[in-house]
Amino acid sequence: YNLGRIGFRLLREDGTEAREIDLGNARQEIDLWTGVVYSRFELNRKEVKVRTVCHPDKDMIGVSIESELLNDGNMSIYLDFPYPDGRYFKHYIGRYDTISGHTSTFEKLAPNSVRITRTMDDTHYYAPLDWTGPATFSRESEKAHTFLLQPRHTSTFSFTCCFSPEPVADVTEPVASIERKS
């Protein structure tokens, strides 16, 4: 089943959520030798550059972002966790609108590190998240299974996230370390 999704929450200059039509000059390339994905696009006349890497031996990704949208507060990272339902497939597998039947909690491990704990019946898994740079981490609402990582006062930002069956700390690695291993 789907463990969760990680994405960007993008805001237009007026503070409303951006849609795909608001993005310009979108381009994405994958280096077939290393597996690194390079993405770029524009929003609010500002360029966004993203580098995504995947660990070869762990369920871990690393993401580096360069954009003034971070500094403006118009770009954040979300982590969203569904209720597993293999029969429901609209955009992603799972029900993101189902609040009951599963729990999502988080604990702060260090100033730039949290661990999200997921529970569904007898199933437990963990999603530790580390980042570099100033940011706030919060739950979107008490009932939601969505968490927001909001970079502050920076135009460059990176984070790593891992999915693990064990509640281990220090499971993530810096983006550059993951990239060297790929």
What is the meaning of each model-derived region?
Residues 1-182:
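Acidic/polar, glycine-enriched structural segments that form the non-catalytic walls/loops
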